[in-house]
Amino acid sequence: MKNKCLLVLLLALGCCHVQAQKSQKDPLSEALVRLNQKVDSELIPGIKRFPLIGISTDISPKRTAVNTAYVQSVILSGGIPYMIPVTDNVEILRQIVSRLDGIVFTGGEDIQPMYYGDLPYEKLEEVSPARDTFDLMVLKMAADRNIPILGICRGLQLMNVAFGGTLYQDLPTQHPSIVNHRQKESGTTPTHPISIIKESKLAEITGQEVLQVNTFHHQAIRKLAPGFKITAWAPDSIAEAIEAYPIRQMIGVQFHPEIFTAAGDTTMHKLFKFLVNKADTFNLAKKIHSRILSIDTHTDTPLWFKNGYSVGLRKDNMVSIPKMEEGKLDAQFLAAFIWQGKRDDASSQKAVESTTRLIQSIYDEVEQYKDFCGIALTEEDLIRLKREGKKAFFIGIENGYAIGKDLKNIAKYKQMGVNYITLCHSYDNDICHSSTHTEDATEGLTRFGREVVKEMNRLGIMIDVSHASEGTFWDVIKYSTQPIIASHSSSKALCDHDRNLTDEQLRALAKNGGVAQLCLLDAYINKNPKAASVCDAAEHLDHMIKVAGIDHVGIGTDFDGGGGMEGGKGDNDLIYLTIKRIEQGYPE
Protein backbone atom coordinates (compact mmCIF):
# COMPACT_ATOMS: atom_id res chain seq x y z
CA MET A 1 0.00 0.00 0.00
CA LYS A 2 2.86 2.33 0.92
CA ASN A 3 4.60 1.75 -2.44
CA LYS A 4 1.37 2.38 -4.32
CA CYS A 5 0.86 5.75 -2.59
CA LEU A 6 4.47 6.73 -3.35
CA LEU A 7 4.02 5.94 -7.05
CA VAL A 8 0.84 8.06 -7.23
CA LEU A 9 2.67 10.93 -5.54
CA LEU A 10 5.59 10.79 -8.00
CA LEU A 11 3.24 10.76 -10.98
CA ALA A 12 1.39 13.76 -9.61
CA LEU A 13 4.61 15.68 -9.07
CA GLY A 14 5.75 14.84 -12.62
CA CYS A 15 2.52 16.16 -14.08
CA CYS A 16 2.85 19.35 -12.07
CA HIS A 17 6.43 19.79 -13.38
CA VAL A 18 5.32 19.36 -17.00
CA GLN A 19 2.48 21.85 -16.50
CA ALA A 20 4.92 24.31 -14.95
CA GLN A 21 7.28 23.96 -17.93
CA LYS A 22 4.45 24.56 -20.37
CA SER A 23 3.23 27.61 -18.50
CA GLN A 24 6.76 29.10 -18.28
CA LYS A 25 7.30 31.64 -21.09
CA ASP A 26 9.88 30.63 -23.77
CA PRO A 27 12.65 33.28 -23.77
CA LEU A 28 12.95 33.05 -27.58
CA SER A 29 10.27 34.47 -29.86
CA GLU A 30 8.56 32.20 -32.36
CA ALA A 31 10.20 34.13 -35.21
CA LEU A 32 13.65 33.57 -33.73
CA VAL A 33 12.96 29.89 -33.11
CA ARG A 34 11.89 29.44 -36.75
CA LEU A 35 15.03 31.24 -37.94
CA ASN A 36 17.30 29.08 -35.78
CA GLN A 37 15.58 25.94 -37.04
CA LYS A 38 16.14 27.07 -40.63
CA VAL A 39 19.86 27.56 -39.97
CA ASP A 40 20.18 24.15 -38.31
CA SER A 41 18.29 22.36 -41.07
CA GLU A 42 20.51 23.75 -43.83
CA LEU A 43 23.89 23.19 -42.17
CA ILE A 44 25.22 20.35 -44.33
CA PRO A 45 29.00 20.81 -44.48
CA GLY A 46 31.19 19.58 -47.30
CA ILE A 47 28.51 19.32 -49.99
CA LYS A 48 29.71 22.14 -52.26
CA ARG A 49 32.81 24.29 -52.54
CA PHE A 50 32.09 28.04 -52.66
CA PRO A 51 35.02 30.21 -53.76
CA LEU A 52 35.72 33.33 -51.72
CA ILE A 53 35.34 36.47 -53.86
CA GLY A 54 36.80 39.71 -52.56
CA ILE A 55 34.97 42.94 -53.38
CA SER A 56 36.86 46.23 -53.17
CA THR A 57 35.03 48.78 -51.04
CA ASP A 58 34.71 52.56 -50.86
CA ILE A 59 35.44 54.63 -47.79
CA SER A 60 33.88 57.71 -46.17
CA PRO A 61 34.38 59.28 -42.73
CA LYS A 62 31.57 57.15 -41.29
CA ARG A 63 31.61 53.87 -43.18
CA THR A 64 33.31 51.41 -45.48
CA ALA A 65 30.73 50.23 -47.98
CA VAL A 66 29.94 48.65 -51.34
CA ASN A 67 26.91 48.71 -53.61
CA THR A 68 24.61 45.80 -52.76
CA ALA A 69 24.37 44.79 -56.43
CA TYR A 70 28.00 43.59 -56.38
CA VAL A 71 27.29 41.38 -53.37
CA GLN A 72 24.09 40.00 -54.90
CA SER A 73 25.83 39.24 -58.20
CA VAL A 74 28.54 37.21 -56.47
CA ILE A 75 26.02 35.26 -54.39
CA LEU A 76 23.84 34.55 -57.43
CA SER A 77 26.92 33.18 -59.20
CA GLY A 78 27.85 30.73 -56.45
CA GLY A 79 30.57 32.71 -54.72
CA ILE A 80 31.01 33.94 -51.18
CA PRO A 81 31.34 37.75 -51.19
CA TYR A 82 33.99 39.23 -48.91
CA MET A 83 34.11 43.01 -48.65
CA ILE A 84 37.76 44.03 -48.40
CA PRO A 85 38.17 46.93 -45.94
CA VAL A 86 40.02 50.02 -47.14
CA THR A 87 43.42 50.12 -45.43
CA ASP A 88 47.05 50.68 -46.34
CA ASN A 89 48.29 48.08 -43.86
CA VAL A 90 50.31 45.81 -46.14
CA GLU A 91 50.33 42.80 -43.82
CA ILE A 92 46.58 42.90 -43.22
CA LEU A 93 45.93 43.16 -46.95
CA ARG A 94 48.43 40.39 -47.68
CA GLN A 95 46.69 38.03 -45.31
CA ILE A 96 43.26 38.90 -46.72
CA VAL A 97 44.31 38.56 -50.37
CA SER A 98 46.09 35.27 -49.73
CA ARG A 99 42.73 33.79 -48.66
CA LEU A 100 40.79 35.01 -51.70
CA ASP A 101 39.97 32.97 -54.81
CA GLY A 102 38.78 35.87 -56.98
CA ILE A 103 38.33 39.64 -56.78
CA VAL A 104 35.88 42.23 -58.12
CA PHE A 105 37.25 45.77 -58.34
CA THR A 106 34.26 48.09 -58.18
CA GLY A 107 33.30 51.52 -59.49
CA GLY A 108 33.98 54.78 -57.68
CA GLU A 109 35.93 58.02 -57.74
CA ASP A 110 38.48 59.27 -60.28
CA ILE A 111 41.98 57.82 -60.01
CA GLN A 112 44.71 60.31 -59.12
CA PRO A 113 46.60 61.28 -62.33
CA MET A 114 49.98 60.96 -60.62
CA TYR A 115 49.61 57.18 -60.87
CA TYR A 116 49.68 57.37 -64.66
CA GLY A 117 52.26 60.15 -64.93
CA ASP A 118 49.87 63.03 -65.59
CA LEU A 119 48.99 66.32 -63.91
CA PRO A 120 45.45 67.00 -62.67
CA TYR A 121 43.19 68.34 -65.42
CA GLU A 122 40.75 71.14 -64.61
CA LYS A 123 37.78 68.81 -65.09
CA LEU A 124 39.15 66.13 -62.77
CA GLU A 125 36.47 65.28 -60.23
CA GLU A 126 36.55 63.83 -56.72
CA VAL A 127 39.47 61.55 -55.94
CA SER A 128 40.10 59.29 -52.95
CA PRO A 129 43.82 58.99 -52.13
CA ALA A 130 43.10 56.36 -49.48
CA ARG A 131 41.13 54.23 -51.89
CA ASP A 132 43.71 54.60 -54.68
CA THR A 133 46.44 53.35 -52.35
CA PHE A 134 44.27 50.49 -51.12
CA ASP A 135 43.04 49.41 -54.56
CA LEU A 136 46.49 49.49 -56.17
CA MET A 137 48.00 47.52 -53.28
CA VAL A 138 45.30 44.85 -53.48
CA LEU A 139 45.57 44.66 -57.27
CA LYS A 140 49.34 44.13 -57.14
CA MET A 141 49.01 41.41 -54.50
CA ALA A 142 46.24 39.69 -56.47
CA ALA A 143 48.15 39.87 -59.76
CA ASP A 144 51.29 38.52 -58.08
CA ARG A 145 49.25 35.49 -57.00
CA ASN A 146 47.48 35.00 -60.36
CA ILE A 147 44.08 35.46 -58.70
CA PRO A 148 41.19 35.82 -61.20
CA ILE A 149 40.03 39.45 -61.41
CA LEU A 150 36.97 41.26 -62.77
CA GLY A 151 37.30 45.06 -62.98
CA ILE A 152 34.15 47.16 -63.31
CA CYS A 153 34.14 50.83 -64.43
CA ARG A 154 36.81 52.33 -62.15
CA GLY A 155 38.06 48.75 -61.74
CA LEU A 156 38.84 48.55 -65.47
CA GLN A 157 40.61 51.91 -65.31
CA LEU A 158 42.52 50.77 -62.24
CA MET A 159 43.87 47.68 -64.04
CA ASN A 160 44.96 49.81 -66.98
CA VAL A 161 46.78 52.30 -64.74
CA ALA A 162 48.39 49.61 -62.56
CA PHE A 163 50.07 48.02 -65.57
CA GLY A 164 51.26 51.18 -67.30
CA GLY A 165 48.29 52.63 -69.18
CA THR A 166 46.82 56.15 -69.05
CA LEU A 167 43.34 57.69 -68.85
CA TYR A 168 41.27 60.49 -70.27
CA GLN A 169 40.56 62.60 -67.18
CA ASP A 170 37.34 64.01 -68.64
CA LEU A 171 35.68 62.56 -71.74
CA PRO A 172 33.34 65.48 -72.60
CA THR A 173 36.28 67.88 -73.00
CA GLN A 174 39.16 65.56 -73.95
CA HIS A 175 37.22 63.20 -76.23
CA PRO A 176 33.94 64.91 -77.13
CA SER A 177 31.39 62.79 -78.96
CA ILE A 178 27.69 62.24 -79.49
CA VAL A 179 27.72 59.35 -77.00
CA ASN A 180 26.69 60.38 -73.51
CA HIS A 181 28.80 58.26 -71.16
CA ARG A 182 27.03 59.56 -68.07
CA GLN A 183 23.42 58.55 -68.45
CA LYS A 184 20.62 59.94 -66.32
CA GLU A 185 18.44 56.89 -66.83
CA SER A 186 18.37 54.09 -64.25
CA GLY A 187 21.19 51.56 -64.22
CA THR A 188 18.94 48.85 -65.62
CA THR A 189 18.35 50.92 -68.75
CA PRO A 190 20.92 50.34 -71.52
CA THR A 191 21.74 53.57 -73.38
CA HIS A 192 24.29 52.61 -76.04
CA PRO A 193 25.67 49.54 -77.80
CA ILE A 194 29.20 48.17 -77.68
CA SER A 195 30.90 46.10 -80.36
CA ILE A 196 32.75 43.05 -79.02
CA ILE A 197 35.78 41.53 -80.74
CA LYS A 198 34.73 38.10 -82.00
CA GLU A 199 37.76 36.12 -80.76
CA SER A 200 37.79 37.75 -77.30
CA LYS A 201 37.13 36.19 -73.93
CA LEU A 202 34.23 38.64 -73.49
CA ALA A 203 32.58 37.33 -76.66
CA GLU A 204 33.12 33.77 -75.45
CA ILE A 205 31.56 34.58 -72.08
CA THR A 206 28.53 36.53 -73.27
CA GLY A 207 27.97 34.78 -76.59
CA GLN A 208 27.43 38.24 -78.10
CA GLU A 209 29.20 40.48 -80.62
CA VAL A 210 26.97 43.47 -79.87
CA LEU A 211 25.77 44.25 -76.37
CA GLN A 212 23.54 47.02 -75.04
CA VAL A 213 25.06 48.53 -71.89
CA ASN A 214 24.59 51.24 -69.29
CA THR A 215 27.20 53.96 -68.75
CA PHE A 216 28.19 56.01 -65.70
CA HIS A 217 31.70 57.36 -66.26
CA HIS A 218 33.48 60.50 -67.41
CA GLN A 219 36.97 58.94 -67.55
CA ALA A 220 38.20 56.19 -69.87
CA ILE A 221 41.26 54.44 -71.23
CA ARG A 222 43.54 56.69 -73.26
CA LYS A 223 46.64 54.53 -73.74
CA LEU A 224 46.26 50.80 -73.20
CA ALA A 225 48.59 49.08 -70.73
CA PRO A 226 51.06 46.51 -72.09
CA GLY A 227 49.81 42.94 -71.81
CA PHE A 228 46.16 43.88 -72.32
CA LYS A 229 43.96 44.05 -75.40
CA ILE A 230 40.82 46.08 -76.00
CA THR A 231 37.96 43.69 -76.67
CA ALA A 232 34.94 45.99 -76.93
CA TRP A 233 34.34 49.50 -78.24
CA ALA A 234 31.65 52.15 -77.87
CA PRO A 235 30.41 53.86 -81.07
CA ASP A 236 32.78 56.78 -80.35
CA SER A 237 35.84 54.47 -80.13
CA ILE A 238 36.05 54.52 -76.35
CA ALA A 239 37.32 51.22 -74.93
CA GLU A 240 34.48 49.39 -73.19
CA ALA A 241 36.32 46.19 -72.23
CA ILE A 242 39.89 44.95 -71.84
CA GLU A 243 41.40 41.59 -70.98
CA ALA A 244 44.78 40.00 -70.35
CA TYR A 245 43.74 36.39 -70.99
CA PRO A 246 45.24 33.89 -71.36
CA ILE A 247 48.44 35.21 -69.71
CA ARG A 248 46.76 36.92 -66.77
CA GLN A 249 43.33 36.03 -65.40
CA MET A 250 42.01 39.59 -65.74
CA ILE A 251 39.04 41.06 -67.55
CA GLY A 252 37.59 44.56 -67.19
CA VAL A 253 34.42 46.27 -68.41
CA GLN A 254 33.60 49.98 -68.45
CA PHE A 255 29.86 49.42 -67.91
CA HIS A 256 28.09 48.09 -64.78
CA PRO A 257 27.00 44.45 -65.23
CA GLU A 258 26.24 44.05 -61.53
CA ILE A 259 23.17 46.31 -61.83
CA PHE A 260 21.77 44.21 -64.68
CA THR A 261 22.69 40.95 -62.93
CA ALA A 262 20.96 41.89 -59.67
CA ALA A 263 17.88 42.76 -61.75
CA GLY A 264 17.85 39.32 -63.40
CA ASP A 265 19.73 39.86 -66.67
CA THR A 266 21.12 36.47 -67.71
CA THR A 267 23.70 37.75 -70.21
CA MET A 268 25.43 40.10 -67.76
CA HIS A 269 25.20 37.39 -65.12
CA LYS A 270 27.60 35.31 -67.23
CA LEU A 271 30.47 37.68 -66.39
CA PHE A 272 30.13 36.93 -62.69
CA LYS A 273 29.63 33.21 -63.26
CA PHE A 274 32.81 33.21 -65.35
CA LEU A 275 34.74 34.89 -62.53
CA VAL A 276 33.37 32.47 -59.93
CA ASN A 277 34.19 29.46 -62.11
CA LYS A 278 37.76 30.69 -62.57
CA ALA A 279 37.96 31.34 -58.83
CA ASP A 280 36.73 27.81 -58.16
CA THR A 281 39.56 26.39 -60.29
CA PHE A 282 42.06 28.65 -58.53
CA ASN A 283 40.75 27.46 -55.17
CA LEU A 284 41.20 23.83 -56.25
CA ALA A 285 44.76 24.55 -57.45
CA LYS A 286 45.63 25.98 -54.03
CA LYS A 287 44.15 22.95 -52.28
CA ILE A 288 46.12 20.58 -54.51
CA HIS A 289 49.33 22.44 -53.65
CA SER A 290 48.50 22.17 -49.96
CA ARG A 291 48.47 18.36 -50.30
CA ILE A 292 51.35 17.70 -52.71
CA LEU A 293 55.08 18.41 -52.65
CA SER A 294 55.99 20.88 -55.41
CA ILE A 295 59.61 21.39 -56.50
CA ASP A 296 61.36 23.58 -59.06
CA THR A 297 64.46 21.55 -59.91
CA HIS A 298 66.68 24.24 -61.39
CA THR A 299 67.48 27.90 -60.70
CA ASP A 300 70.73 29.87 -60.87
CA THR A 301 69.89 32.21 -58.01
CA PRO A 302 73.17 31.75 -56.05
CA LEU A 303 74.96 33.72 -58.80
CA TRP A 304 73.13 36.80 -57.53
CA PHE A 305 74.07 36.53 -53.87
CA LYS A 306 77.28 38.51 -54.43
CA ASN A 307 75.16 41.41 -55.78
CA GLY A 308 73.23 41.75 -52.53
CA TYR A 309 70.23 39.66 -53.54
CA SER A 310 68.40 37.92 -50.70
CA VAL A 311 65.99 34.97 -50.87
CA GLY A 312 63.94 36.47 -48.06
CA LEU A 313 62.99 39.64 -49.90
CA ARG A 314 60.60 40.10 -52.81
CA LYS A 315 62.85 41.95 -55.25
CA ASP A 316 63.38 41.82 -59.02
CA ASN A 317 64.89 38.35 -58.93
CA MET A 318 62.60 35.52 -59.96
CA VAL A 319 63.25 33.35 -56.91
CA SER A 320 62.40 34.33 -53.33
CA ILE A 321 60.52 32.98 -50.34
CA PRO A 322 57.64 35.48 -50.80
CA LYS A 323 57.28 34.49 -54.47
CA MET A 324 57.41 30.80 -53.56
CA GLU A 325 54.57 31.40 -51.13
CA GLU A 326 52.53 33.30 -53.72
CA GLY A 327 52.97 30.50 -56.27
CA LYS A 328 52.41 27.76 -53.66
CA LEU A 329 55.85 26.27 -54.36
CA ASP A 330 57.32 24.11 -51.60
CA ALA A 331 60.92 23.63 -52.68
CA GLN A 332 63.59 25.03 -54.95
CA PHE A 333 66.86 23.62 -56.22
CA LEU A 334 69.56 26.29 -56.02
CA ALA A 335 72.29 25.40 -58.48
CA ALA A 336 75.91 26.32 -57.92
CA PHE A 337 76.65 27.25 -61.53
CA ILE A 338 80.20 27.45 -62.83
CA TRP A 339 81.14 28.72 -66.29
CA GLN A 340 83.17 26.41 -68.47
CA GLY A 341 86.78 27.56 -68.48
CA LYS A 342 90.13 26.19 -69.50
CA ARG A 343 90.68 22.52 -68.77
CA ASP A 344 94.23 22.64 -67.43
CA ASP A 345 94.91 21.56 -63.83
CA ALA A 346 95.12 25.08 -62.39
CA SER A 347 91.88 26.29 -64.02
CA SER A 348 90.05 23.12 -63.01
CA GLN A 349 91.12 23.60 -59.39
CA LYS A 350 89.84 27.18 -59.43
CA ALA A 351 86.49 25.84 -60.63
CA VAL A 352 86.37 23.49 -57.63
CA GLU A 353 87.13 26.35 -55.25
CA SER A 354 84.54 28.66 -56.83
CA THR A 355 81.88 25.96 -56.64
CA THR A 356 82.67 25.30 -52.98
CA ARG A 357 82.25 29.00 -52.19
CA LEU A 358 78.93 29.11 -54.03
CA ILE A 359 77.59 26.14 -52.08
CA GLN A 360 78.66 27.76 -48.82
CA SER A 361 76.88 30.97 -49.86
CA ILE A 362 73.65 28.96 -50.15
CA TYR A 363 74.00 27.79 -46.55
CA ASP A 364 74.81 31.34 -45.42
CA GLU A 365 71.78 32.76 -47.22
CA VAL A 366 69.36 30.17 -45.87
CA GLU A 367 70.71 30.66 -42.34
CA GLN A 368 69.64 34.32 -42.48
CA TYR A 369 66.03 33.21 -42.94
CA LYS A 370 66.01 29.99 -40.92
CA ASP A 371 62.61 30.86 -39.44
CA PHE A 372 61.13 30.68 -42.93
CA CYS A 373 63.20 28.08 -44.80
CA GLY A 374 65.78 25.35 -44.47
CA ILE A 375 68.24 23.21 -46.42
CA ALA A 376 66.74 19.90 -47.56
CA LEU A 377 68.90 16.87 -48.28
CA THR A 378 66.15 14.27 -48.50
CA GLU A 379 62.44 13.86 -49.19
CA GLU A 380 61.91 13.54 -45.44
CA ASP A 381 63.51 16.97 -44.94
CA LEU A 382 61.10 18.47 -47.46
CA ILE A 383 58.08 16.89 -45.76
CA ARG A 384 59.25 18.11 -42.36
CA LEU A 385 59.87 21.66 -43.58
CA LYS A 386 56.45 21.83 -45.22
CA ARG A 387 54.80 20.69 -42.00
CA GLU A 388 56.70 23.45 -40.20
CA GLY A 389 55.39 26.00 -42.69
CA LYS A 390 58.83 26.60 -44.19
CA LYS A 391 60.23 26.54 -47.72
CA ALA A 392 62.90 24.01 -48.66
CA PHE A 393 66.09 24.60 -50.63
CA PHE A 394 67.94 21.72 -52.24
CA ILE A 395 71.44 22.12 -53.70
CA GLY A 396 72.62 21.16 -57.17
CA ILE A 397 75.72 21.84 -59.26
CA GLU A 398 75.44 22.99 -62.87
CA ASN A 399 78.45 21.90 -64.94
CA GLY A 400 80.61 18.92 -64.06
CA TYR A 401 83.60 21.22 -64.65
CA ALA A 402 83.16 21.80 -60.90
CA ILE A 403 84.49 18.27 -60.26
CA GLY A 404 87.88 19.24 -61.62
CA LYS A 405 90.29 16.38 -62.25
CA ASP A 406 89.67 14.48 -59.01
CA LEU A 407 86.77 12.08 -58.41
CA LYS A 408 87.16 12.67 -54.66
CA ASN A 409 85.52 16.07 -55.16
CA ILE A 410 82.24 14.28 -55.86
CA ALA A 411 82.27 12.82 -52.34
CA LYS A 412 83.09 16.26 -50.95
CA TYR A 413 80.07 17.75 -52.70
CA LYS A 414 77.90 14.93 -51.41
CA GLN A 415 78.95 15.81 -47.87
CA MET A 416 78.05 19.44 -48.59
CA GLY A 417 74.49 18.39 -49.46
CA VAL A 418 74.61 18.32 -53.27
CA ASN A 419 71.76 16.25 -54.74
CA TYR A 420 72.55 16.42 -58.45
CA ILE A 421 75.32 17.46 -60.83
CA THR A 422 74.66 18.61 -64.39
CA LEU A 423 77.42 16.86 -66.35
CA CYS A 424 78.23 19.82 -68.60
CA HIS A 425 77.06 23.26 -69.66
CA SER A 426 77.26 24.83 -73.12
CA TYR A 427 80.75 23.56 -73.98
CA ASP A 428 82.46 20.17 -73.95
CA ASN A 429 84.39 19.36 -70.78
CA ASP A 430 86.47 16.51 -69.37
CA ILE A 431 83.31 14.50 -68.65
CA CYS A 432 81.26 14.66 -71.84
CA HIS A 433 80.15 16.48 -74.96
CA SER A 434 77.66 19.34 -74.79
CA SER A 435 74.54 19.80 -76.93
CA THR A 436 75.50 23.35 -77.87
CA HIS A 437 79.11 24.33 -78.62
CA THR A 438 80.48 20.87 -79.30
CA GLU A 439 82.93 19.27 -81.67
CA ASP A 440 80.55 16.37 -82.30
CA ALA A 441 77.02 16.03 -80.86
CA THR A 442 77.07 12.29 -81.50
CA GLU A 443 79.98 11.88 -79.12
CA GLY A 444 79.17 11.21 -75.49
CA LEU A 445 80.95 10.36 -72.25
CA THR A 446 84.72 10.35 -72.01
CA ARG A 447 86.55 7.64 -70.09
CA PHE A 448 86.72 10.05 -67.13
CA GLY A 449 83.00 10.72 -67.63
CA ARG A 450 82.14 7.06 -67.23
CA GLU A 451 84.07 7.05 -63.95
CA VAL A 452 82.12 10.13 -62.86
CA VAL A 453 78.81 8.38 -63.62
CA LYS A 454 79.91 5.33 -61.65
CA GLU A 455 80.97 7.42 -58.64
CA MET A 456 77.78 9.50 -58.66
CA ASN A 457 75.74 6.29 -58.73
CA ARG A 458 77.73 4.94 -55.77
CA LEU A 459 77.26 8.10 -53.71
CA GLY A 460 73.59 8.61 -54.57
CA ILE A 461 74.00 11.89 -56.45
CA MET A 462 71.55 12.28 -59.34
CA ILE A 463 73.02 12.57 -62.84
CA ASP A 464 71.60 15.52 -64.78
CA VAL A 465 71.76 15.31 -68.59
CA SER A 466 70.41 18.78 -69.38
CA HIS A 467 72.89 20.56 -71.69
CA ALA A 468 74.38 17.18 -72.71
CA SER A 469 74.69 16.02 -76.32
CA GLU A 470 72.48 13.20 -77.57
CA GLY A 471 75.54 10.97 -77.55
CA THR A 472 76.11 11.79 -73.89
CA PHE A 473 72.43 11.18 -73.10
CA TRP A 474 72.49 7.67 -74.56
CA ASP A 475 75.82 6.85 -72.92
CA VAL A 476 74.45 7.86 -69.52
CA ILE A 477 71.33 5.74 -70.11
CA LYS A 478 73.69 2.85 -70.91
CA TYR A 479 76.17 3.21 -68.06
CA SER A 480 74.08 4.58 -65.17
CA THR A 481 72.67 1.99 -62.79
CA GLN A 482 70.31 4.58 -61.29
CA PRO A 483 67.50 6.75 -62.71
CA ILE A 484 68.70 10.00 -64.25
CA ILE A 485 67.16 13.46 -64.65
CA ALA A 486 67.08 16.33 -67.11
CA SER A 487 66.74 19.17 -64.61
CA HIS A 488 65.77 21.85 -67.14
CA SER A 489 64.92 20.74 -70.68
CA SER A 490 61.81 21.05 -72.86
CA SER A 491 60.27 19.21 -75.83
CA LYS A 492 62.18 19.11 -79.12
CA ALA A 493 59.02 18.04 -80.94
CA LEU A 494 57.43 21.39 -80.10
CA CYS A 495 60.56 23.56 -80.37
CA ASP A 496 63.54 22.24 -82.32
CA HIS A 497 66.41 23.40 -80.10
CA ASP A 498 69.57 21.46 -79.28
CA ARG A 499 68.82 21.87 -75.56
CA ASN A 500 65.49 20.06 -75.79
CA LEU A 501 64.71 16.35 -75.62
CA THR A 502 63.28 14.24 -78.44
CA ASP A 503 60.26 12.05 -77.81
CA GLU A 504 62.59 9.06 -78.04
CA GLN A 505 64.73 10.51 -75.26
CA LEU A 506 61.67 11.25 -73.14
CA ARG A 507 60.46 7.67 -73.46
CA ALA A 508 63.93 6.33 -72.64
CA LEU A 509 64.13 8.59 -69.59
CA ALA A 510 60.78 7.30 -68.37
CA LYS A 511 61.82 3.68 -68.92
CA ASN A 512 64.97 4.44 -66.94
CA GLY A 513 62.76 5.65 -64.05
CA GLY A 514 63.99 9.21 -64.41
CA VAL A 515 62.32 12.59 -64.75
CA ALA A 516 62.48 15.37 -67.37
CA GLN A 517 61.80 18.86 -66.03
CA LEU A 518 60.24 21.49 -68.28
CA CYS A 519 62.50 24.53 -68.71
CA LEU A 520 60.89 27.98 -68.87
CA LEU A 521 63.52 29.57 -71.09
CA ASP A 522 61.89 31.36 -74.02
CA ALA A 523 64.21 30.04 -76.76
CA TYR A 524 63.51 26.46 -75.65
CA ILE A 525 59.74 27.02 -75.70
CA ASN A 526 59.04 28.95 -78.88
CA LYS A 527 60.99 29.27 -82.14
CA ASN A 528 60.29 32.99 -81.80
CA PRO A 529 61.61 33.65 -78.27
CA LYS A 530 60.00 37.10 -78.05
CA ALA A 531 56.59 35.52 -78.59
CA ALA A 532 57.08 32.80 -75.96
CA SER A 533 54.58 32.70 -73.12
CA VAL A 534 53.58 30.47 -70.26
CA CYS A 535 50.79 29.20 -72.54
CA ASP A 536 53.46 27.70 -74.81
CA ALA A 537 55.15 26.21 -71.76
CA ALA A 538 51.86 24.58 -70.76
CA GLU A 539 51.71 22.93 -74.20
CA HIS A 540 55.24 21.57 -73.76
CA LEU A 541 54.29 20.20 -70.37
CA ASP A 542 51.19 18.54 -71.77
CA HIS A 543 53.16 16.97 -74.64
CA MET A 544 55.93 15.71 -72.35
CA ILE A 545 53.37 14.14 -70.00
CA LYS A 546 51.64 12.39 -72.90
CA VAL A 547 54.96 10.99 -74.14
CA ALA A 548 56.74 10.10 -70.89
CA GLY A 549 53.88 9.79 -68.41
CA ILE A 550 52.92 12.14 -65.61
CA ASP A 551 55.26 10.45 -63.11
CA HIS A 552 58.27 11.28 -65.27
CA VAL A 553 57.74 14.99 -65.94
CA GLY A 554 58.42 17.96 -63.68
CA ILE A 555 59.44 21.62 -63.81
CA GLY A 556 62.93 23.14 -63.76
CA THR A 557 62.46 26.81 -64.59
CA ASP A 558 66.05 28.04 -64.97
CA PHE A 559 64.88 31.21 -63.21
CA ASP A 560 67.62 33.76 -62.50
CA GLY A 561 69.72 32.04 -65.15
CA GLY A 562 67.96 32.88 -68.40
CA GLY A 563 64.55 31.37 -67.71
CA GLY A 564 61.34 33.37 -67.81
CA MET A 565 58.77 34.51 -70.35
CA GLU A 566 55.47 36.35 -70.54
CA GLY A 567 53.27 35.03 -67.76
CA GLY A 568 56.09 32.99 -66.24
CA LYS A 569 58.50 35.45 -64.67
CA GLY A 570 58.95 34.07 -61.20
CA ASP A 571 58.07 31.41 -58.64
CA ASN A 572 54.74 33.15 -58.06
CA ASP A 573 53.61 32.29 -61.60
CA LEU A 574 54.11 28.53 -61.33
CA ILE A 575 50.60 27.92 -60.01
CA TYR A 576 49.42 28.83 -63.52
CA LEU A 577 50.71 25.48 -64.77
CA THR A 578 48.63 23.68 -62.14
CA ILE A 579 45.57 25.67 -63.20
CA LYS A 580 46.14 24.66 -66.82
CA ARG A 581 46.41 20.99 -65.83
CA ILE A 582 43.05 21.25 -64.04
CA GLU A 583 41.43 22.99 -67.01
CA GLN A 584 42.79 20.29 -69.33
CA GLY A 585 41.09 17.64 -67.23
CA TYR A 586 44.08 16.07 -65.50
CA PRO A 587 43.10 14.17 -62.32
CA GLU A 588 44.00 15.73 -58.99
Which residues does each predicted region cover?
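N-terminal beta1-alpha1 cap of cysteine-dependent amidohydrolase-like domains
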Residues: K2, Q21-I152, N160-V161, Y168, ...
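Sec-dependent N-terminal signal peptides
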Residues: C5-L13
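Sec/Tat signal peptide C-region and signal peptidase I cleavage site
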Residues: H17-Q19
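Distinct, well-ordered alpha-helical segments
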Residues: G165, E380-L382, D406-I410, H433, ...
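Short, surface-exposed beta-strand/loop micro-motifs that present aromatic residues
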Residues: T231, I238-Y245, I251, I321-P322, ...
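Glycine-enriched alpha-helix->loop->beta-strand junction motifs that scaffold or abut catalytic
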Residues: I247, K328-L329, V418-Y420, L459-I461, ...
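N-terminal hydrophobic targeting/anchoring segments and the immediately downstream early-domain regions
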Residues: L284-D440, D496-L506, A510-Q517, L521-I555, ...
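Metal-dependent enolase-superfamily TIM-barrel catalytic cores that perform enediolate-based chemistry
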Residues: M416-E470
